[in-house]
Each structure stands twice: as C-alpha cells, then as structure tokens.
Amino acid sequence: MSNARQSLVIAAALLLAACTSTPEVISPSTVATAPQTARVTAGLESYMQQRARVERVGFRLRHAAAPACAKTNETKAELGLIVWSLANFSNDEDRAHLQGAFALTNAVTVALAVADAPASRAGLKAGDILTHVDGVPLGDGKGATERFIQLSNAAAQSGPVRLTRAGGKTVVAEPQIVCEFPTLLVRSPEINAAADGRVLAITTGLFELTHNDDELALILGHELAHNTLGHLKATEPKEKPGGLLDAFVRATIGTAVAKAVTRPYSIENEKEADYVGLYLMARAGYNITAAEAFWRRLNETTRAQAVTATHPSGEDRLHALQGAISEIKAKQKAKQPLEPNLKPRQ
C-alpha cells in the first residue's frame, strides 16, 4: 500500500523495545535522536494493546510465508518475545509512569509475549522478569536487555531456549521458523502501510480502520508479499546486534526522527502483492472473504488520495481480489496446496 508520494517511517528504529524477533539494531547514524530527556510513554497502554495484535497477526503470517522466504535465505528462528527495563528510559516521568503502570524495574522484563508464539506457549507473559538464558545470567540495568537479545537470538538458532524467571523457574521455548522481516506499528494518523525489503509497517491510523484480525492480516499479508516477492530489495546493509533501545522507544512514540523513506511500486507489483498476500492469509488460517468488504471501506476512506499512479483502481482491485478468492477457495475445497499461480520471472 506504499504511496510514491507519501513517506512512512519504517526503519527498524521504530521498534518500541528490545525484540527477539529482530536482533538487528539501528546504529546512531540511522536515527536522528531527540534529547535524552524527551518523554515517550504518553498513551503507551493503548499502544501496547494495539501492538499485541499486530505482533500476533504478523507472526502467524511470517510463519506461513517461511517456505517462500527460505528460497532467498530470509528466515530465522524466533521466540516471539519483547522485553524492556527501566534502564531503557532516561526521562524521570517515563520511569515513574512505567513503575506505576507496569511495575517495571531495572530487571529484564517481558513487555509482550506474542500470543500463540513459542514464548507464550512456554508460559511466559507480560510482566515476567527474566534472569538467565540457557543458564547465562542477564544481570540488570544498562545493557541487560541488549544482552538478552544477543543471547536469546543466538540460542534460538540452534534449538530450544531455556529461559529462567525470577524465583528460579525455567521454561523451555521451542523457536519457530518465520520470515525474518519484523512487523512494526508506527504511531501516525496517516492511513498507510509499507514494506522495504527488510521490515513490514502499518500506521496506527490504518490499524484503527481494521475491525478484526482478518482485515489486519489482509494488510500485513499484502506488505509481506512485497518482501517475499523481492519487489524492493533493501540496499542498506543490516546492522549487527547491539543497543540503542532508547532510540527504539523515542522513534516509535514520535519524539525522535527516523529516516523517512518513499517506496514506490508499480501497478503490476501492487496487483501481485494483493494476489500473493491473499494466499499468505489463507495459509495462515485467516478468512480471505474479509478482503472485499475491507477494500471497499478503505477505498471509500482514501479515495481522495492521489494513489492511482502506483495502485490499481478501486474497481480493478476488487475484481482481481474476487477472482483470487474464488481461486483459493477452489483449491481449499479440492484440498490442493495453497500455492499462487505466478508467472515465471524473466
């Protein structure tokens, strides 16, 4: 859904906190950071509720698309876990808010265990304090969340990961293979979503137009399809694991300025992403019939925007979606593999 005339902040710095689904960490050169005292937690409770849905739907889709991503060596083993600590926040008001609203301390704490992902299936939940990864102590305070990212990601690539909670109880999470593209929820009233070959992003403005997970899966599936199809391969090198969690936070809340990127796709690319995105939806177990009503509603909402240069017209898009839905349903009825009928690439 990227608009050639609209910019969308989708750099990995938009992550709210340390996330085991993306060990790559933005370097100082890629983020224009706000002053260290900028406040970031206003409205955080509602944002985290929204993000939980985005992470859940994104994880399912990325798992469903893993066979396609494996062909380009773009998969990884993930736990579906986001952590944070007070050490990631420098503003006194933020720290007080997080202590009161989330009982956050300087210990490595689960901010979000993605529903139906390995960590949550192992029994982890928001608020759990983590002390060890495979027996290696995490410590607390500065650097602890970064240490967790590095240890847990390294462990996940070789098998089950043992995570020890405060009190000594250890759970074992079996990593799941997914496409390596993290899913970002960007705080912006703009109605947009994007993919740049490295990440998927949706704005809160577009998120709030969705009525259920099926509609959210339609959007994220479309963006994921852009990446799996290689419509826009990232030209920038991926960063090595590291720190800067405060930059993640500031960028997401909007008090820092990350790079804005314009990612135009051709009309043919958009049609292909619509088509393949529906297949990813179906393979992930979502209701593809939600597509028609949502696109009608979205088209009505955004028809004043100048997107026709890079997007199919509303009626053309709906007609193509209807055809794809019929095709997928026929394959489901015949118990055939849900593989899109793509033309060979030149």
How does the language model describe each region?
Residues A119-G143:
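Conserved PDZ fold ligand-binding element
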Residues D94-A113, I129-T131, P182-D213:
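Active-site scaffold of zinc-dependent metalloenzymes
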Residues T41-V108, E174, L185, P189:
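PDZ/PDZ-like peptide-tail recognition elements
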Residues E146-L184:
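PDZ-domain C-terminal substructure recognizer with occasional recognition of PDZ-binding tails
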Residues T22-K76, T255-T310:
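Short helix/loop segments within enzyme catalytic domains
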Residues L232-A258:
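Post-HEXXH active-site segment of zinc metalloproteases
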Residues L15-A18:
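C-terminal motif of bacterial Sec signal peptides marking the signal peptidase cleavage site
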